[in-house]
Structures are given as C-alpha cells and as structure tokens.
Amino acid sequence: MKPSTSTRARVRAAFVLCLLLLSSVSRAAAQQAAQQAATLPVEKVKQIEALVGAEMAKQKIPGMTVAVVSERRVRWAAGFGMQDIENNVAAKPATVYRLGSIAKPITAVAAMQLFERGKLDLDAPVQKYCPAFPEKQWPVTTRQVLGHLAGIRHYKSDDEFNSTRFYASVAEGLNMFKDDPLLSEPGTKYNYTTHGYSVLGCVVEGASGQKFADFVNENVFRPAAMERIRVDSVADIIPNRAQGYRVTDKGVLTNSPLADNSYKVPGGGFVSTAEDLARFAVALQTDRLLKRETLELMYAPQKTKDGKETSYGLGWGVAKRPTGERTVGHSGGQQRVSTFLHMQPDQGLAVVIMSNLEGARLGALAQQIGDIVLK
C-alpha cells in the first residue's frame, strides 16, 4: 500500500525538522568550541586578575580595562574597578577611553599604507603633501617625522597641552606650532613630538586626497574591525565613556580638567576600547593592514645621522627584552587616561591596558601580563 500524500509530506517535514535541529546543535557546538578556544585558561586569568588588582591598589587607579591577544587572536578582555566613581559605573570591556599617543601608530600605519600604494614618498619634503606646514631652515621629510627626528617641537607649556579650544581640521591644528623654528637639524637628534604627528596627519590628507579621519576610518578601522574607535569630542555624547582622574601632590583623587584634543587628532585625539586596540594588533599581526616587509620597516629602530640607534621606529617604540624577544608598542598619557599597547609580534602576543588615571605607569604591568599569557 502506497503512503498517502499527506503521510509523505509529514515524513518530509519531520526529516527537514530533524536536519534543522542537527544543524542547530552543530552550530551551537561549533560556537561553544570557538568561544572556548578564544579564551585564556582559567588559571592564567586568575593570575592576571590578581596582578592587575595589586597594581591598581598600589597606584590608586580607579578603573582599568585589559585586553589580551594570544596566537594572533583576541583571547580575553575584562574591566576592573570603576569607569565613573561619582555615578558608580563599573569598568568593562566596552568602556571607552582616550587613546593618548597610541594614536601615533595608527597614523603611522595610515602613512605607510600610502607608501605601499606609491602615493607617498617618505624622503620627499613634507610640503609636497602638506603645504600648510611652512618650509624651515632645513628640509623635513615624512620619514623623519615618523621617527621623531624632524626637529619639530613638542608642547611648549601646560596651557598648550591643556588647550580647551576647538580646532576644526588637522590643518587648523598646525597653527599652534607651524611658525616656530625647528629645534635641531632633522636627522641629528631624537625629539619626541606630538605636533610632528599633526604634520603627518596633514601629509596623509595630501597624499590620499581625503580628510584624515575619513582615510583612517576606511583603511585602518574598518579592515581591522575596530567598532568603537572615533575622533574624540568633548561635546558629543559618547556611550560608556570613562570619567578621568588625577592624584594631587597631596595624594587626593580629583576629576581631570577639561581638555580639547582637536588640535592633535593624528597624535593623540581618538577614543576607543581596549578590545578595539586588540583588534588593531591582530590586524597588524595577520598582515591585514600592511605587508610584512612594511611592518618590518616600521619596527626597525631609526638612526640619527651619526649612526646611533634610537628606541623608536616608524610610529612605534621598539626594544628587545633581556630574554631576546623584540617588543613593539606605545604608551599614551593625557587628561583622563594612561594607556599602553604592548606587542611581541614574533610570538603573536599583544596586551592592551587602558586606565582612567593620569600618570599611571603601565608598561611593566603589560609585560608581566604578557609573560603570564606566554607561559
């Protein structure tokens, strides 16, 4: 006896339902396995938590977020303490902090992308791309700006550093320093300079034909899957933004003063999360933003004209640990925050620390966390 049409339909429906259930279970199992693979072992997490807690207590840091990259994947992120004491808001992976000078490697990556594409000559005078920066007593090149060898000055005073004025563009921000003479002949001395990176941002605009923020959004942030990063603004409502603090000479914790970073977006004017910066590290280590040979060029210590190595590459602080591993990274410090991005590219490691205390010392902590991860 042949099964009826309705019976065959019920059998087919049951079969399809079974397949859907099996597929759902398989996807869930795969997702669970992926989540487990993307996390650190519990014992390492406990060690990191204890280390972070002790350091926060020692330095009186109100809030902190840490993210870890291992085997070139984001493995773990967590918040500690308070992102906002007055409103009793705990720090978390989604807490948004100012980056400080970690903006510099981002801008350097943008410049080196243009170099790879043949749009930027690192050894041409910067005025070829940034005519808004006047010619000086000596020629200045983009390579020298990248390595802090251009002789462009840093902050002149606390009033300048604590500026509350809004600057509408990268070129307008140059007005703060562009007419000042160079501190030294380019190539002869290492002079760390945030203002120099404003010139670099102007170079990126000239070489790309785009506004600086648009270029980094399209060419750095999107390919790296950085979802929360944006140009800082004291006026905009930015969800999950951390309040910032400082400790006075008498040891009293106070709110940070207002400061507008619009004059230095390329060198210190972004906000984001620790997870975003971890994704930036992953994108670099997996060659999604630049070719490997370009990264090696950036990670090589620059030299002054007399042949002496500096501790800075093209946009990155570079060093070797006593055990021989090379490290690449950058610190950040400004009103409201202290930050650190530590990478050991040969080991596929990165540690990001973002805190809401000015003047916090985070470099040693980042290395110690990295040592725990690599054990």
Q: Predicted segments — roles?
A:
Residues L357-K375:
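Short, gly/Ser/Thr-rich active-site loops of penicillin-recognizing serine hydrolases
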Residues A13-S24:
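Bacterial N-terminal signal peptides
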Residues A28-A30:
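Boundary at the C-terminal end of the N-terminal hydrophobic targeting segment
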Residues G329-H330, T339-L357:
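Short, well-ordered beta-strand elements
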Residues F80-D84, Q137-Q334, T339:
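Short, surface-exposed loop or secondary-structure junction motifs
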Residues A57-A67, E86-Q144, S184-H195, V265-G268, ...:
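Short active-site loop at a secondary-structure junction
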Residues L40-Y97, K119-A124, K178-D179, L253-T254:
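Short, conserved catalytic-motif segment at the N-terminal edge
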Residues K2-F15:
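Bacterial N-terminal signal peptides that target proteins for export
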